[in-house]
């Protein structure tokens, strides 16, 4: 897919630093090394598509009614095979963190943050640290709102049932999904799409995961 941002509701550009990039035409994923695929320097192996001056390019889709009309369970089912309850029940207690708790730096594999059940309005903050790596990514499921700040580096999938806000200068190598808005960013987020298992990166070892992670975590 050549989509950087996909939203069911409206979208707007805030901040001079906003920009999206795609791999240049004629260059396949297989032409690049793993290091090049994960490089967050837009001057390397990428072409500018969207920015504040030019507006949204072809890689930004918003107002998609199929997303706007989807329930939280519909969206969840596009990325995970088990239901939320089933997945929660498969995780050991060490992988279930209370609402508002932060994932420890250095963590890999799958974590559920928040209670099992109806989406929570409790905010979880991840401020700094490194979570996940290319050979053992993290799958973070936050039942509630999530704020990512500082110079956090996360490799893997982030799934938020509530609202997502970004401050600071975090780097995320993977994908971010949020069931509810509005979602906002006042910092400088570096988001490098990493498909893990379908577009040139090998299937990772997701510790304690019952999730299916092909292609774009799941092509839909």
What do the PLM-derived regions correspond to, one by one?
Residues 1-220:
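Primarily marks folded extracellular/lumenal domains of secretory and cell-surface proteins
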């Amino acid at each position: 897919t050549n989509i950087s941002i996909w939203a069911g509701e409206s979208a707007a550009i805030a901040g001079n630093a906003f920009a999206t990039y795609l791999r240049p035409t004629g260059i396949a994923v297989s032409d690049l090394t793993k290091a090049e695929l994960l490089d967050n320097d837009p001057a390397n192996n990428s072409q500018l598509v969207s920015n504040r001056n030019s507006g949204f390019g072809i890689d930004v889709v918003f107002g998609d009614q199929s997303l706007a009309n989807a329930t939280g369970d519909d969206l969840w089912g596009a990325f995970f095979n088990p239901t939320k309850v089933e997945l929660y029940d498969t995780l050991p207690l060490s992988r279930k963190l209370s609402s508002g708790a932060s994932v420890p730096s250095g963590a890999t594999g799958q974590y559920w943050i928040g209670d099992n059940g109806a989406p929570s309005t409790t905010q979880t903050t991840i401020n700094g640290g490194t979570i996940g790596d290319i050979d053992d990514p993290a799958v973070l499921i936050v039942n509630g709102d999530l704020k990512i700040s500082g110079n956090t580096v996360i490799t893997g999938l982030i799934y938020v049932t509530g609202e997502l806000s970004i401050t600071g200068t975090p780097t995320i190598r993977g994908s971010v999904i949020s069931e509810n808005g509005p979602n906002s960013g006042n910092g400088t987020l570096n988001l490098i799409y990493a498909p893990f298992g379908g577009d040139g990166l090998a299937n990772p070892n997701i510790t304690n995961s019952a999730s299916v992670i092909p292609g774009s975590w799941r092509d839909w």
